[in-house]
């Protein structure tokens, strides 16, 4: 018989740097998960992706065991890295804070493809372009 799911927790953590301090500790602690075990397993799996922010979905079962799925970095994080900026525009569509090329958009779309709700690379690129536009990043050819 399959284990019963008690909770599903979604967090965004820096790769290889999960610690029992907030936000990880309180989020997992209230569901009775062994926080240190999660931190060790997460850090071991993400050690090669240092410097990235990774969304993780943790499924906690009634017997306090857990599994987790690591997703691809957020599109906004990848766009900021590609454009070489710290943060998006405070006034998107009015203030342009950076530029990315179609080639960079294509690379980001390929990276994000498993997590995007898109059937083709073109559709994925449109999603990423929309994110760029809403962050005040201009897409140039």
From Swiss-Prot:
Record key words, sorted: Methylation, Ribonucleoprotein, Ribosomal protein, RNA-binding, rRNA-binding
GO MF annotation list: large ribosomal subunit rRNA binding; structural constituent of ribosome
GO cellular component: cytosolic large ribosomal subunit
Post-translational modification: One or more lysine residues are methylated.
CDD domains, alphabetized: Ribosomal_L11
Coiled coil: none
GO biological process, one term: translation
Pfam families reported in the protein's UniProt record: Ribosomal_L11, Ribosomal_L11_N
InterPro entries in UniProt: Ribosomal_uL11 (IPR000911), Ribosomal_uL11_bac-typ (IPR006519), Ribosomal_uL11_C (IPR020783), Ribosomal_uL11_C_sf (IPR036769), Ribosomal_uL11_CS (IPR020785), Ribosomal_uL11_N (IPR020784), Ribosomal_uL11_N_sf (IPR036796)
Family annotation (SUPFAM superfamilies): Ribosomal L11/L12e N-terminal domain, Ribosomal protein L11, C-terminal domain
NCBIfam families: L11_bact
UniProt function note: Forms part of the ribosomal stalk which helps the ribosome interact with GTP-bound translation factors.
UniProt family annotation: Belongs to the universal ribosomal protein uL11 family.
Subunit text: Part of the ribosomal stalk of the 50S ribosomal subunit. Interacts with L10 and the large rRNA to form the base of the stalk. L10 forms an elongated spine to which 3 L12 dimers bind in a sequential fashion forming a heptameric L10(L12)2(L12)2(L12)2 complex.
PANTHER family, alphabetized: 60S RIBOSOMAL PROTEIN L12, LARGE RIBOSOMAL SUBUNIT PROTEIN UL11M
Name the record gives this protein: Large ribosomal subunit protein uL11
Organism: Thermotoga maritima (strain ATCC 43589 / DSM 3109 / JCM 10099 / NBRC 100826 / MSB8)
């Amino acid at each position: 018989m399959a284990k019963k799911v008690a909770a599903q927790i979604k967090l965004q953590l820096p790769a290889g740097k999960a610690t029992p301090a907030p936000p990880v500790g309180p989020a997992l602690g209230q569901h009775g998960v062994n926080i240190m075990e999660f931190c060790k397993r997460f850090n071991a799996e993400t050690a090669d992706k240092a410097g990235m922010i990774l969304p993780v979905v943790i499924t906690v079962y009634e017997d306090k065991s857990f599994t987790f799925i690591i997703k691809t970095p957020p599109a906004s994080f990848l766009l900021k890295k590609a454009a070489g900026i710290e943060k998006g525009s405070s006034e998107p569509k009015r203030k342009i804070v950076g530029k990315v090329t179609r080639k960079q958009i294509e690379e980001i779309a390929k990276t994000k493809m498993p997590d995007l709700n898109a059937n083709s690379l073109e559709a994925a690129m449109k999603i990423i372009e929309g994110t760029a536009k809403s962050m005040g990043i201009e897409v140039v050819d």
